[in-house]
Regions:
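Short charge-dense sequence patches
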Residues: 7-19, 60, 152-157, 171
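All-alpha amphipathic helical-bundle segments outside canonical DNA-binding/catalytic cores
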Residues: 75-85
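Short glycine/serine- and small hydrophobic-enriched flexible loop segments
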Residues: 22, 65-69, 94-98
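Conserved nucleotide-sugar donor-binding catalytic segment
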Residues: 1-50
Length: 182
């Protein structure tokens, strides 16, 4: 059943949303941005980690792990491994790849540990995903940072999936200039 995990201090809304989503028959997961989340409120938990990418992403891995554990408890992970893979890319992997290489090593190691033995750690499940999603997850499963060139390729391929070629080129240029969003 649906449980609000009070042990999760950061991202508890995401964990609860996925508890509901995984058990709903009429809800679809989309990666479109539905609202602009304001993270700049002084003293908020999000504000404290805003400029420390590694710490923030390691917290995101904890959020993902809580969702994964909840879905594993009721056997939902096996039926929705592709959704879990997409969510992982949106929540953790894309931003980890922005760190380009060795700086994302701890994050990728944490992701590999979280996925170990899960339904997402499965070639058959990844075959159900878009190739760019499967490639990002497979890179994370290795548990160490990809080379900077591969990071850029994985990001570009994922952007093509989400935004088309033109949108991906715009995001690539923004990433090269150090901007977060286009």
């Amino acid at each position: 059943g649906i449980v609000f995990d009070e042990t999760v201090k950061y991202g508890e809304d995401q964990v609860f949303d996925f508890a509901v989503y995984g058990r709903s028959r009429k809800t679809a997961l989309i990666s479109n941005k539905l609202y602009e989340y304001r993270v700049a409120r002084k003293g908020s938990l999000m504000d404290t980690m805003r400029y420390d990418d590694e710490t923030r992403l390691l917290e995101h891995v904890k959020i993902y792990s809580a969702v994964l554990a909840d879905w594993q408890r009721d056997g939902l992970d096996a039926h929705h491994a592709d959704d879990l893979a997409y969510f992982l890319c949106d929540l953790v992997l894309y931003d980890a790849l922005r760190l380009l290489g060795s700086d994302c090593g701890k994050v990728f190691a944490a992701v590999a540990a979280a996925l170990n033995g899960s339904a997402v750690d499965n070639d058959a499940a990844l075959a159900q995903c878009a190739p760019s999603v499967a490639a990002m997850v497979r890179a994370a499963l290795i548990g160490k940072a990809p080379a900077a060139r591969l990071c850029k390729k994985l990001m570009f391929d994922y952007d093509v999936l989400r935004f088309g070629r033109l949108g991906a080129c715009k995001r690539m240029a923004a990433n090269a200039l150090g901007k977060r969003e286009v």
